[in-house]
Amino acid sequence: MHFHFSKMHGLGNDFMVVDCITQNVFFSPELIRRLADRHTGVGFDQLLVVEAPYDPESDFHYRIFNADGSEVEQCGNGARCFARFVRMKGLTNKYTIHVSTKKGKMVLNVEEEDLITVNMGVPEFEPNKIPFRAKQSEKTYILRVGEHTLFCGAVSMGNPHVVTVVDDIRTAAVETLGPLLESHERFPERVNAGFMQVVSRDEINLRVYERGAGETQACGSGACAAVAVGILQGLLDEQVRVHLPGGELEIHWQGPGKPLYMTGPATHIYDGQISC
């Protein structure tokens, strides 16, 4: 099997992006794991697949696979790269692009060729829709994680997130708590774990341990989840700058029931082709 691809990143969260409209490529979990290997493959956090639309209201269907081969519902940084890719490859000339995903629909707005605003949809706090095992929706939950007791927020941005407020992002125990939270029994589909330091009401520092990928340089849906939880808990205002290890995102949310918007860069690194 031989196919063309692009390597892209959103704030260091890196992707292999493949057009499966003009190419016929099948990605098995084993093949994805081989391609994701940074020593013997292409190397990436996620594989993004562009498919023909599943319904007449969408321009494309957007699929996301983690480096471990698992398919996931959402990737905000990937969505920005997806928008740049389909324009760069001549698959569309639209500036507003409608895509379907495993979990729903998204709208991608191209502000400039490398600056994209994504309508991430309405944050979902109902436990059974995250999914998260809890009797009722709360702003803050208490989780036992190993020897630790954590006060967390839980939300779905199309994929499940748990967010913990920390005093200093530099000393947060992301390496140890991240994998424990990811596989916590109260999250039946596993979860992305965010560690948020509130700098001010319009600024946070954030690290994210991603489900199936580990800690990444940036996580767009994680940034959205952190801001949504912070606003719900009364810690943040509606316009927030998020500092991640790989760079900055701007998040805007007017509160429960309203869609959340994320603005950030999408960077093309190179084009390649591979036989496997």
From Swiss-Prot:
GO terms for biological process: lysine biosynthetic process via diaminopimelate. Pfam families: DAP_epimerase. Pathway: Amino-acid biosynthesis; L-lysine biosynthesis via DAP pathway; DL-2,6-diaminopimelate from LL-2,6-diaminopimelate: step 1/1. Keywords: Amino-acid biosynthesis, Cytoplasm, Isomerase, Lysine biosynthesis. Substrate binds at residues 13, 46, 66, 76-77, 159, 192, 210-211, 220-221. SUPFAM superfamilies: Diaminopimelate epimerase-like. It comes from the Bacteria. This is Diaminopimelate epimerase. It comes from Vibrio cholerae serotype O1 (strain ATCC 39315 / El Tor Inaba N16961).
